[in-house]
Every structure is written in C-alpha cells, then in structure tokens.
From Swiss-Prot:
This is Probable 5'-nucleotidase. Coiled coil: none annotated. It is an enzyme of class 3 (hydrolase). A divalent metal cation 2 binds at residues 91, 123, 224. Its cofactor is a divalent metal cation. Residues 1-21 form the signal peptide. The keyword Transit peptide does not apply. It catalyses: a ribonucleoside 5'-phosphate + H2O = a ribonucleoside + phosphate.
Length: 593
C-alpha cells in the first residue's frame, strides 16, 4: 500500500537540497589551506548522546556522537584534508561513571585513538586534585598545552605540559597556544597550591609575542577560557588567527540548526577584528561529543586569513530515530515517513549519518563491561532510618510531616561538593523534590544506586540573588507544587531552611520564616537586602517546575554552571563519609490546614 508523506516533509527535503553545497572555500595560488577539526567539553560522555530535533513539523529523538563515530569522522576528515589539525579545547573529565570509575583512563585511551594533535586543560581536569590530573595525564599520549597554568618546580605536575607548540603542515609553521579559565579553576575546582595561574589576556599576549619573535605568522589559540573571554582576547590582542573555544558549551551555527530546534548561540565561525584590523575566527562545538567542529581556513602569504568557512557536524545514528508524541513519549516511525525524514536530514549540511570505528567499538565495549561490574560496588554505607524520596513523599503531609528527606540529602551533597573547591563561596542549595527519584534505604549504596536516585544528569548552577529573591524563589516553587503545577517542584534545601503554610495568606504568600546557616552552624534570618550565592540544579535554573523568578534571574543576569553532576556530588559525599548517619529532618516545617 502506498504511504502518505506529509507535504511538510517534502518541503523540508526541498529546503535541504537548496542548502547542499552552499559553502565553498576561496583560495588562490600560493595560499595555505588548513582544516581545523575540534571538540570541547566531552566530560567523559563516551557513548552516543540523545538529541531532540524538529524536522518537518515533527519532534524527533535520535542518538548523536559517541567516540566510535567521532573517531571515524576525524579519520575521514584528516584523510580528505590537505592539511589538518585535530584539537580538544578542554574538560575531557567529570560527568559520567566513566570518569568516576576509571579516573580518566577511559577518556585518555579513547582520546589517544582519536589522534588529537593537542589538548588544553579545562577547569574540571583539576576536580580530583593534582594527583587525579596526573593519573589522567599518565594514560594520555596527546600533547597538552596551557600557557597560564604553571606548576612550580616542586609540583607533581611540573613538566607535564607546555605553554605552546609549533607544528608544520606542508612546510608552513603553525603556532598553537593553550589556555585555561582562571577564576573557575581556582574557585570551583581543586588545583594544588603549587599551581600558579596567570591572567588569560596577559598569558596569551606573552605567548603570541614569543611566537611572532620566532617568525610564526599563523597562530591558533586553543582556549578553555569560555566564549566571551575568547572574544575579548580576539578584540585586544593582535596576531591570533583562530580561537578554538571551550568551557561555555556553546553551539555555533546558522539558521539550518535553528530550524532543527537546536540552541544556537551565534554564527560559526564568529568573526572579530583584532587591534591590527585583521580577522580572528572563534569557534566552539557545543558539548559531550554531540558534534564535531570543522573549520576550513585559507591564509595568504603574510599569514592573514582570507577565507574561513565551516560548521559543526552532528553524527546521527539513524537506527535510533524516533518520534516524540504529545505525551513526550518516544514512538517508532512508519517506514515511509522515516525514509522521508532521513532524506530531509541528509540534505541538512550539518547532519552526517554516523559510521563507527570498529576498533573503538571494541575498546568501548570492554570499558562498558568493566563499568557495569564496578557500578555494583559500594561507595559508602548509610546508617539509621530510611530517607524518604520519590513521588509519594514530595510534599509533607500528616503521615509524613518531614516530606522528602532524600531531597534534602541530595542538596547537602551538592552544597558539600561546591564548598570543597578552592576559594568558591556558596551560601545554600535548593533542590526540587522531583529530582530525587526514590527512597534512600540504610545499608550499602552503590554507584548504580546514585545514578538511579539522580538519573537526569543535572549539573550544579550558581546564581547570585538577594534575600528577597531567595524568598520569592521558594514562594514560586510552593505555588507550583501546591497549586496547579507539579508536586515535583516542592523545594528542599541545604544551608537554608524555612517554615511555610499549605494555604497562602491574604497576600498570596506561604513562607512564614526563612533562615540560612552560617559557617559556624548557627541559623540566622535571611536579610532581604543582602546578597546570597545560591546553588540549584540546571533544570530549575531554566525556570522549569514553576521556578519562574529563578529562571528570569538566570536569563537576564546570568549564572555559573559548574558542570558538576548531581550524582557525582552524591558519590563524592559518600566516599568522604563512608558511614553516614541518615538525616531525619528535611529542613522544612510545613503547616497543614
């Protein structure tokens, strides 16, 4: 029987056909062409990642990336390019059980197979301290660069990386400078006191001058300083040609990615003029190995870029393609519609149907087997009573006046994690009850238990708020949880406690008393005019679950995503507290009708 293919699908195919072949590199005799292949912030995401796409009026879900596909595509691009550099802009570690269990070994092995020419340090490379970074670098064969992270002579990390390097392609010398973000590494990670950090602009200026003094006129900055800082560097320092960015997890691209419903921040590449009036091109390739950046540039004889074109490449696993229904569930596609959608996707320049490297599949399979075995190992023991969690215990009631003590426990582990880092300061953490998916029973807790309790891979986001805003954030959550929203919004905290009534007063308010905990353990009332640094998970930071005020603050004033995973924080907490006595208090006093 002939299947009906919706007109919108046919229309999407026509648009895709019009886009194919629309990007061309302009070069002349005597020019030098270079292809820069890059990723950043893969955060131990070694397997394909789920991605939602909007195609021809349909919401689709498919898996993209994964190291087996990335390695295949890197090797293909290398083989097809006249001259290529393959670069990683930092934050290889922290984010999945692969990092927790293998402490960088799995990441290093796969990065070696990928054949990166250079890797720069990110802030999360220091999350397990100097020794943790040294262990990762022991397995890593990729040359490491960082011009502004300088271990002293007595440091265990001394001599393990260089500030910069010069490579040759087709007889042309290319300088590559490494750079890390200073503030986040110092304040939100765990570098040793034997590490000196140099201001980003100062370090780049110095390294650029040194390159130029050696006669190098093609310079690439491989920088984990974040997109905004990298644009600032481009505007203030002459001599740099390309900046391969990391840290900010930005997806750059054109309108074709926007039509797919992806969170495009700006164009790829971003063109900025240096103080010398020469172009600098800044690129970044989102996160978690979901895409692979490809930038093709042409240098003239003086080392100035005359042409720069490229895009992020999404390596889509076609056998995972599904349609999302109105109920948010995933459903298989009918064959005719599936084929039409695949044609539309094939005509989108940024979409490549993934092929995988067989050797990487085998290597990763061994790590997966080991991960499954290690996942059943205990990370700590909880003694005392059960800490209630899950959907039944989200809101305190007469039978369970404390509500979700498990959610308070999750918040405490997040607060403990961020307070353990450097000079960073956070006053309190708020966690929504829907994020803690089960009870926490006394006994051994395994790695798998941690990811069962916290399956959403939310990260810890730091937000600066006033006391009045902190109170309103809790009010918003209570209204959503107790009104016409979801009980999953009900707020619990660490370093913060409150008393609230079930029904609002005549002013629509429920909070009766709100306190924060000082470093000496004393509880004091929240000062509505005072500033507080609040930790929240990345889900409610986007204003989800009725956290309207919080979402508005983040979208207008910004926030700092630490990219510390909630499950990782819990694991770290239990490792440090091998026999932890369960909380019996949820930090909430709830007045029923």
């Amino acid at each position: 029987m002939k299947r009906f293919i919706p007109h919108r699908v046919i229309h999407a195919v026509c648009i895709g056909l019009a886009l194919v072949g629309c990007r061309k590199l302009d070069s002349r005799a005597g020019d030098f062409e270079l292809t820069i292949i890059h990723i950043n912030d893969h955060h131990s995401h070694l397997e394909p990642e789920p991605l939602e796409l909007a195609v021809a009026g349909e919401r689709l879900r498919a898996a993209v990336g994964g190291y087996a596909a990335l390695v295949h595509e890197i090797q293909r691009l290398r083989a097809e390019s006249k001259n290529a550099l393959v670069l990683h802009a930092g934050d290889a570690l922290i984010g999945t059980l692969y990092s927790t269990l293998f402490r960088g070994r799995a990441d290093a092995v796969l990065m070696n197979h990928a054949g990166f020419d250079f890797f720069t340090l990110g802030n999360h490379e220091f999350d397990n301290g100097n020794e943790g970074l040294k262990e990762f670098l022991h397995y890593l064969e990729v040359p490491v660069l960082s011009a502004n992270v300088v271990p002293n002579a007595a440091s265990t990390l001394h001599g393990l990386w260089k500030p910069s390097a010069i490579v040759e392609r087709a007889g042309e010398r290319i300088g590559v400078i490494g750079l890390d973000t200073v503030k986040k590494t110092v304040e939100s990670s765990s570098p040793g006191k034997d590490i000196n950090f140099i201001d980003e602009i100062e370090a780049v200026r110095r390294a650029t001058v040194e390159m130029q003094q050696q006669g190098v006129n093609k310079i690439i900055l491989l920088s984990h300083a974040g997109f905004e800082k990298n644009c600032e560097i481009a505007q203030n320092i002459s001599g740099i040609d390309v900046i391969v960015s990391g840290d900010t997890h930005y997806l750059l691209g054109d309108e074709s990615l926007g039509r797919l419903g992806l969170p495009v921040v700006g164009e790829y590449p971003r063109k900025i003029m240096s103080p010398a009036g020469e172009p600098v091109y800044v690129v970044e390739a989102w996160e978690y190995g979901k895409c692979l950046g490809e930038l093709n540039v042409v240098f003239d004889r003086t080392g100035v870029i005359t042409s720069a074109v490229g895009m992020p490449r999404f390596l889509l696993h076609t056998n995972t393609l599904q349609k999302k229904g109105a109920d948010r569930k995933n459903y298989p596609l009918e064959e005719a519609e599936r084929e039409a959608l695949l044609v539309a996707l094939r005509m989108t320049p940024e979409i490549i149907f993934a092929q995988e490297n067989d050797q990487i599949i085998s290597v990763l399979e061994e790590f997966k087997k080991e991960k499954e075995a290690l996942g059943a190992q205990a990370i700590g023991v909880i003694t005392g009573a059960s800490m209630r969690g899950g959907s039944v215990h989200r809101v305190p009631d007469a039978q369970n006046p404390q509500g979700s003590v498990a959610t308070r426990f999750v918040a405490e582990t997040m607060l403990s994690d961020i307070q353990s880092f450097g000079a960073g300061k956070v006053d309190c953490v708020i966690q929504n009850a829907g994020g803690a998916r089960s009870n926490i029973q006394p006994g051994e807790i395994t790695y798998n238990d941690a990811y069962t309790l916290l399956p959403f891979s939310n990260t810890l986001v730091l937000v600066d708020v006033s006391g009045a805003e902190l109170k309103q954030i809790i009010e918003d959550a209570l209204q959503f949880a107790l009104g016409d929203g979801s009980t999953g919004a009900f707020p619990y905290g660490a370093g913060v406690r409150y008393e609230a009534r079930q029904e609002p007063d005549e002013h629509g308010k429920r909070v009766i008393k709100l306190e924060v905990q000082k470093k000496d353990g004393a509880w004091v009332p929240v000062d509505e005019r005072a500033p507080y640094r609040l930790g929240v998970n990345s889900y409610i930071a986007r204003g989800k679950d009725g956290y309207k005020t919080l979402g508005e603050i983040v979208s207008t004033r910004g926030a700092e995503d630490t990219y510390l995973r909630d499950a990782e924080s819990l694991i770290k907490f239990l490792r440090a507290h091998k026999n932890f006595r369960a909380y019996t208090d949820s930090n909430v006093i709830f007045r029923l009708k």
